[in-house]
Amino acid sequence: RHAALPVSKIANPQDQPTGRATSLSRLWPFLRPQKSLGAGWLIFLAVSSGTTLLLPAMVRRIIDHGFKETSLTSLNATFMGLFGLALVLAVATAGRYFCITLLGERALASLRERLYDHVIRMDVDFFERSRVGELISRLSSDTEVVQALIGSGISVALRSAVMLVGAAIAMIWTSPRLAGLIALVIPAVMLPIMLFGRKVQRLSRLSQDRLADAAAIANETLNAAAAVKAYGREEIESRHYAEAIRAALSTARRRISTRALLTMIVIVLVFGAITVVLWAGARQVVAGTLDPGVLGQFVLYAVFAAGSVAGLSEVWGDVLRAAGAMERIGELLSERSQITDPPAPLRLASPTTGALRFEQVGFHYPSRPDRAALEQFDLHIGAGETVALVGPSGAGKSTVLALLLRFYDPQQGRILLDGIDLRELRLAELRGAMALVPQEAAIFAGSAAENLRFGRESATLEQVQAAARDAAAAEFIEALPQQYDTALGEHGVRLSGGQRQRLAIARAILRDAPLLLLDEATSALDARSEAVIQQALERAQRGRTTLVIAHRLATVKRADRIIVMDGGRIIAQGKHADLMAENGLYADLARLQFIDDGS
């Protein structure tokens, strides 16, 4: 069960990471709209960096002249100037932090919105290939890694880069000879960054993948909590999750060790270089060829430069992690739905009659290319007609509904609605003409009213209540603590199976669509509720084209026509009595599978 195809392998099967610049360039569309914040941040960055670089000059002045000043006024002015620089630095730093943090939050919000919008619009086949837990990991943990880079990493990186360049120029201006010594160790500092960088990126990507695997396992297990308990698998499932977490921890430990080693080497090399420079400068001061203030100023610039290099090496790890996360996000954004709107869509007539025609339709599921789900399927359903599809499991009944909803497109033939090929219609218009009652009702954590309005947001409370009454759902809804405003819990855990099904039927009634698709809509109801629902469905079916998949004889007998399917083909059709008289597959199903209520 846990060996399902990871999302990370869907779009890009290669294990090697793509270029860091390519991965991070995907962030630009989300950063570009924040130009004003970016400009403000750059201004504050320039002011804070410039102010910081002025501090060593003030220290030099104090060392060389301040303690020799005979005028108290001049001394006070020097220290007031130093305090003034500190005030400017404080304001600029606060402004820089505000701008970059808000920029990061806005960019991240746009990224998450774009990612969720992209995922929710993917076709059904994508979700069948993917693991929900991994998708949630992309939306949460991966974007949080990117947020760490945008919200603080970029700021630290650019501030460190500006300070490094500024300090380098200042060191050359202050003492070219000592600056030359610093230049000699730069290759030694940069070499480990280059060597360790790619390894950190690869481990960062692998670490995110392992966390996504753990999230997928948790999502699957928690969504099936009742089954886990029924089969006594708590310990086994806990062990599976622990193994996934330990795998993620092992990868994270390798990444952390590599990054820690990189930071240690850089700090040793940088501050070793400063020690050498300080030693050389001290010899010049002793020899009288260098003023103490100049050495102090140079050392401060060297410390700034060293801190900047250390900051860059630290942020480099965040850059590599973000590059790995954006690579995963980029793979997801690169996925393309195979079911899309046509370039020049046609429009359905208003009102839509609901006439359907299947013409030599052939279809196989992408996951089962060697097995036809429908084959040479021909069927005409007149406007307002109620047609029941019956047949053994795997006959292709649910496939007919899936193709009508354009969850998939047939590989052969075509399907027409009011004479228009479904592929020539906008998906929103096509699906807006249909109301589906699935075998397992999808109930959300919102209120009862919100669940009923799922297919029709604009419905008034009176319309919601009327639909609930028609579906025999009003009685139990009005018995809830807040009636229609009562939250139903995730997956409708506060409701019975029959209550959830009645909510789904009420939702379809409220949608008021010209086509009604019922996939064993009364399967979870008791006999009394089914009798009430059958009356409601009969009212809902008037003037509408209805396609019913049913295992109950009472449901089938009310249909205008019964279509008997087997192996993806139509093998018989007609009225109940005629099909029973033929004593074929339908008669066998009626005797063995259908539930006869005695009618």
Enumerate the predicted regions with their spans.
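Membrane-integrated ABC transporters
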Residues: R1-L55, F67-L82, R96-G104, D117, ...
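Juxtamembrane helix-loop junctions of ABC transporter transmembrane domains
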Residues: N12-R20, I43-F44, T51-D64, L85-V132, ...
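An intracellular "coupling" helix at the cytosolic face of ABC transporter transmembrane type-1 domains
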Residues: P33-K35, V124-D125, S141-I150, I154, ...
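Helix-loop-helix
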Residues: S71-T73, A77, A170-L184, R254, ...
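Conserved catalytic Walker-motif region of ABC-type ATPase nucleotide-binding domains
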Residues: V119, Y241, I329, F358-Q360
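Pre-NBD coupling/linker segments of ABC/ABC-like ATPases
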Residues: Q338-P351
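Transmembrane helices of ABC transporter permease
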Residues: P33, L37-G50, V88, S152-L206, ...
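ABC-type nucleotide-binding domain
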Residues: A349-S599
